[in-house]
Amino acid sequence: MSSILVEGGKSLRGEINISGAKNAALPIIVASLLSSKTLVINNVPQLSDVSDMLFILKSCGVHVEIVESGTIALTANNISCHFSPPCNIVKKMRASIWILAPLLLRLGQVRIALPGGCAIGQRRIDLHLAALKAFGANIQLEEDYISANCSSRMHGISFKFDKVSVGATITAIMCAVLANGSTKLANCAQEPEIADLCYCLRKMGANITGIGTANISIIGVKELNGANYSIIPDRIEAGTYMVAAAITQGKIKLNNVIFKHLKSAITKLRLSGAIIQYQNENSLIIEGANIIKPLNIQTNPYPNFPTDLQAQFMSLMSIADGVSIITENIYENRYMHVFELIKMGANIVIQSREAIVTGVKKLHGADVIATDLRASVSLVLAGLSAAGITRVKRMHHLDRGYESLVEKLQNCNARVQRIPD
């Protein structure tokens, strides 16, 4: 365990290179299980979630080679149902549910522990299991385990998700690429990370159309090839550092970004008073305003405002000049950071799914506790703007989704340091 000490009150100024997207890296890493050939993945962020997923794949028999920093080569030519993914790691990662489909397709049977992850609401797996069953899998839940088998090759289906789900969309896509026949998926999640997975699978030989839309069509192939693929930049990391500039009235240049992926965040930041200029094809400069204007924000599936930026924007709105209303429509329990922000002087009232944020002139430093990945970084952001020193505890959450955050902030003159508890 470790903490981050943040001394606030300094405008951030500098340049940050955005890392590869965690939420694209994880499913693409899992996709290596779909082929016996080598998949080389570039722009892989160095995160604990990535390390844990690679460890899970190693336990399944995948050969993992670190080619160089940010590049890995995965070869799944020796996987076996006799390998057992480690329960302690599977249980703490909700993304581990994705190994079910490829292992089932390759081996015909699989048994894994129920997945975990951040303690945010009811991140259920029922949509994943419904998709697997529709493709022909037999599923049994045994206390803390999922057992699945498929007596023959999975078959193509027409399937409409009951609700938009990033994770279940990924599971269904992985089933469909090797299923026998044609699959039509409706009401799919449209996140860029799902499109990135599809483009990687297409490079491996998958037949996929409708990428990036709510309706995806896939014609199954008998086998996939290897490929060399680069992961898209992390739009959530980029949005986080944009808030860092805005909340400190600073000026930061961000490199390796995709503008269209940031459209909703950029729109809200401009409404708050920030000045954002595009520099070239993949760089932008954001300059924070002296007076931050309040916002109304509703989280919804892409291309709308992302739930993964809700906590960061709440920190920003806590010092806005007026009242903001933030509505969390994705998860029912994603306001755990609110109680920590209140310790720092924020004026926030929760009413069901709404957070009513009345801006204060200044936050003050305090000892606060991170409860999940995005909450942890929102508290660091609040600390950057606060008077005095903020200590954010349980920073292992941060390591799951932010590569070198302390170093990147220090490069922008932030007074932050990591210390052991």
UniProtKB/Swiss-Prot annotation:
Main localization, broad class: cytoplasm
Residue intervals passing through the bilayer: none
Enzyme Commission designation: 2.5.1.7
Physiological role: Cell wall formation. Adds enolpyruvyl to UDP-N-acetylglucosamine.
Residues binding phosphoenolpyruvate, per UniProt: 22-23
Reaction catalyzed: phosphoenolpyruvate + UDP-N-acetyl-alpha-D-glucosamine = UDP-N-acetyl-3-O-(1-carboxyvinyl)-alpha-D-glucosamine + phosphate
Binding annotation for UDP-N-acetyl-alpha-D-glucosamine: 94, 163-166, 308, 330
Lineage: superkingdom: Bacteria
Catalytic site: 118 (proton donor)
Keywords on record: Cell cycle, Cell division, Cell shape, Cell wall biogenesis/degradation, Cytoplasm, Peptidoglycan synthesis, Pyruvate, Transferase
Catalytic EC class: transferase
NCBIfam families in alphabetical order: murA (TIGR01072), PRK09369.1 (NF006873)
Metabolic or biological pathway: Cell wall biogenesis; peptidoglycan biosynthesis
GO terms for MF: UDP-N-acetylglucosamine 1-carboxyvinyltransferase activity
UniProt record, GO biological process: cell division; cell wall organization; peptidoglycan biosynthetic process; regulation of cell shape; UDP-N-acetylgalactosamine biosynthetic process
Stored CDD domains: UdpNAET
Entry's Gene Ontology cellular component terms: cytoplasm
Homology family: Belongs to the EPSP synthase family. MurA subfamily.
Organism, as annotated: Orientia tsutsugamushi (strain Ikeda)
Gene name as annotated: murA
Protein name as it appears in the record: UDP-N-acetylglucosamine 1-carboxyvinyltransferase
2-(S-cysteinyl)pyruvic acid O-phosphothioketal PTM sites in chain numbering: 118
Pfam families: EPSP_synthase
Protein localization: Cytoplasm
KW Flavoprotein (keyword) present: no
Lineage: Bacteria, Pseudomonadati, Pseudomonadota, Alphaproteobacteria, Rickettsiales
